Amino acid sequence: MVVANDDVSSAKRSESNNTGVSQISKQEIREKFKSFYTREWGQTQPCRETSLHKFGVCSNVLRNEGNAPFMLSRGPVEGGVSKVAVLFHGLSDSPFFMREIADILFDEGYTVIVPLLPGHGKRDATSDMSDWDLAERWQAHVAEVIALADEMGDELIVGGFSTGGALAVEHYLNSANNIDGLMLFSGALALSENAEGMSRIWGIKLLARIIDGTYQTHGPNPYKYPNVAGLAGLELMDIINAIREKIDEGSQIQVPLFVAHSKDDATTPISGVEHLLAHSNASNTFFVVDESYELCHADLVVNDKLLNAMNFNESMLTQQEDCAIPKSNPLFSTMAFMLRAFVN
């Protein structure tokens, strides 16, 4: 394990932008959050799983409640200061995979929002995963969730896993004013050489759409699609290219940045986040899991608790790849310690 820590500091909004807690009530926040998904799915319903601090939005269109978007909140913070965090999940994933990171931030006093990106967590996602405007739908949802989060307090940190991290960075580079810190877990700022090469082939999106056909959502993991749709992967590449263009034009990251990544990540090579860090002017924390741990891309945010709750069905595997069976990150507790230091 290698940990590079560059003057870790909390992600605080400048005093000039500190307007205190918005007057929006907890009920208004929940209704607005729910309205995003009523519009997207057509109908929502209360989740059966309830807890004192958790508010989820469920629907019959979802595979199960573990795929549902949720919020963690305690209510107004004494002294009129509220901290809000937004965590976006990865491509083919669901909010389930953000649970443990969300709990860490909640324990540190944050209200945490974990949205569900369009096209994810559903029983039937064929029309979504063949949508030419899927990336634009992701971006629009990211924007509306962050706008809601900005109403809720005077400190806002945003990030996510893989594609979720890329979407957070892309939004920051286009609308930086209300974001005070970024968090990337296996951030998808580069893809494998093969994937990036394929994305440059003329007409590849049409071909991918044809090959994808009827998209399979049911598989061994109840909270993750069994495969990434080809067209959706190319939509992600568009997001990555947009980030690179912004950086090439001279854009810089001006807020504290937390980055956690495995050197053995073959899905999103670590070079992508290293390039971003090279264009940052803030205090950063870079947590690197050494190659000797052989930690796969998706396993970075998995601890023993999440793995046990996953109920992964190995008997349904159709292929035996090195990273096909989820494992817990042996350095998760150390990563969590570094994240806590970052936000304090």
Language model feature labels by segment:
Residues 65-120:
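Short, surface-exposed "cap/lid" segments of acyl-processing enzymes
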Residues 100-101, 268-282, 288-291:
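Short alpha-helix in the alpha/beta-hydrolase fold that links the catalytic acid
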Residues 123-152:
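Catalytic nucleophile-loop/oxyanion-hole region of alpha/beta-hydrolase
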Residues 159-168:
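Gly/Ala-rich beta-loop-alpha elbow adjacent to hydrolase catalytic centers
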Residues 183-194:
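Active-site nucleophile loop of the alpha/beta-hydrolase fold
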Residues 253, 259-261, 265:
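Short beta-strand/loop motif that positions the catalytic acidic residue
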Residues 263-268, 294:
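Acidic catalytic loop of the alpha/beta-hydrolase fold
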Residues 296-344:
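Catalytic active-site module of serine/aspartate enzymes centered on a nucleophile-bearing elbow/loop
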